[in-house]
């Protein structure tokens, strides 16, 4: 799909139509919009089958409400967030604050591969192997300094994981 920055219909998370983008080097990215979440069942519990869809057997249930940009209001009008741990508590995910609040983050759609010593994110190729954490960090920083590219942080990974376990995933 080709689109412009003003096209409001190029993605629809409710319909599981993800905002995918391809950069000039062919790398593929997906937009993770800022959201609030609540773990509504299974908080701090483990099950026999982590992949089960039954909360009593698996990883529990996560509800997600997308935020309106960088405001403190969700798409449903919720403005009260506890931002504390616990089942049933609503939290604005911390991954969307990297020195300042952002409306979302671009995440590599696939594991990074090596193309002549440069990062490339494309399907169907082997992941970059035999690289030190220091070199991963440096390569990620240098990918696009203007856009603040960096090695994924734990909370950003958590944002992707939580979203994938919600009804949108």
Residue ranges and their predicted role:
Residues 38-45, 114-119:
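Short, solvent-exposed loop/turn elements at domain surfaces
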Residues 25-26, 57-60, 64-169:
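Short aromatic-cysteine micro-motif
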Residues 46, 51:
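A motif-centric signal for short, conserved binding hotspots located
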